[in-house]
Amino acid sequence: MAEFVRAQIFGTTFEITSRYSDLQPVGMGAFGLVCSARDQLTNQNVAVKKLMKPFSTPVLAKRTYRELKLFKHLRHENVISLSDIFISPLEDIYFVTELLGTDLHRLLTSRPLEKQFIQYFLYQIMRGLKYVHSAGVVHRDLKPSNILVNENCDLKICDFGLARIQDPQMTAYVSTRYYRAPEIMLTWQKYDVEVDIWSAGCIFAEMLEGKPLFPGKDHVNQFSIITELLGTPPDDVINTIASENTLRFVKSLPKRERQPLRNKFKNADDSAIDLLERMLVFDPKKRITATEALAHDYLAPYHDPTDEPVAEEKFDWSFNDADLPVDTWKIMMYSEILDYHNVEGVPQMEDQQFPPQ
């Protein structure tokens, strides 16, 4: 039985195994507190995330289960990886991941990025997205603070808490506004992996310019700012809007022509402008894919088609529509944790049918 030690962080009790020491708070989110710590087994610095009340409601229990399943499935150099998971005596769940020194948001607010760093960071983002999308996963909340970077400029995408299946009827109000694709704002209905490409385009533009490209104050202002640069959406995009109110709003906007991105990004080279043009397209189906972006001239210095892997298999989303009680999610979660630690002789849930028969 592991020995647990307690520490108070921001008024929150961290109850972790004695394997980890030197807890220091590094971030607070809606669903958990993250601390840095020293892994005394590997002598490496790690990030320890405490999930707040993971079994308080069926919705939170499912979210916790989904996050763990994604952690276990997504194994790629440009995606954050799980190094340990445990349940404390108080039944809190802790995820332990590698610790990277900073994130893209902090880098962008501290100094301008040189061209070779912009290229290398964008290459790694696209390399990670190629893999994630091939697994049938949409991140949905890609933004600079979710892109971690270490001192060697290695980049990893993190925080798949909002990630969901590729689903033509996907719904929700999800990513941070500045980086949110127009199809999320306009329809709240149909979107897919292309939303991540839009977000990556906004991040690319921010790396080039040093400030957010579309800093909207609210949804209406956000969309207006986008149309000032990219023009009015084409009719075939407008016709996909499901909400009558949204449709009226879009049709009430003054007609605008798309502005040449060259006018805004005067110091960027032509290949950067061309790639950005292909990422920031209103019609999701005409947006460049991660695989296509990797082969673009702008990323040629780093492109290696033999070292840009895809997922071996699609992520299994069959649990996602299941409406189960907390205790069932908890049993399934415990089973996944034991499986992660290769504990033999535990009841497995692989044969669980969703929804249960």
From Swiss-Prot:
Catalytic residues as annotated in Swiss-Prot or TrEMBL: 141 (proton acceptor)
Where is the protein situated, by its record's location annotation? Cytoplasm; Nucleus
- What residues bind ATP, as annotated? 26-34, 49
Q: Which residues in this protein are found as Phosphothreonine?
A: 171
Q: What EC number(s) does this enzyme carry?
A: 2.7.11.24
Which comment does the entry carry about domains? Answer: The TXY motif contains the threonine and tyrosine residues whose phosphorylation activates the MAP kinases.
GO BP terms, alphabetized: stress-activated MAPK cascade
UniProt-recorded name of the protein: Mitogen-activated protein kinase hog1
User: What family name appears in the similarity comment?
Assistant: Belongs to the protein kinase superfamily. Ser/Thr protein kinase family. MAP kinase subfamily. HOG1 sub-subfamily.
Residues where Phosphotyrosine occurs?
A: 173
Q: Name one GO cellular component term.
A: nucleus
Superkingdom of origin organism: Eukaryota
Q: Which InterPro entries match?
A: Kinase-like_dom_sf, MAP_kinase, MAP_kinase_CS, MAPK_p38-like, MAPK_Sty1/Hog1, Prot_kinase_dom, Protein_kinase_ATP_BS, Ser/Thr_kinase_AS
Chain location of the short sequence motif TXY per the record: 171-173
Reproduce the UniProt comment on modification after translation: Dually phosphorylated on Thr-171 and Tyr-173, which activates the enzyme.
Q: Which cofactor does it need?
A: Mg(2+)
Gene name, Swiss-Prot/TrEMBL: hog1
Q: Which residues form the Protein kinase domain?
A: 20-299
MF terms (GO), sorted A to Z: ATP binding; MAP kinase activity; protein serine kinase activity
Listed A to Z, the keywords are:
Activator, ATP-binding, Cytoplasm, Kinase, Nucleotide-binding, Nucleus, Phosphoprotein, Serine/threonine-protein kinase, Transcription, Transcription regulation, Transferase
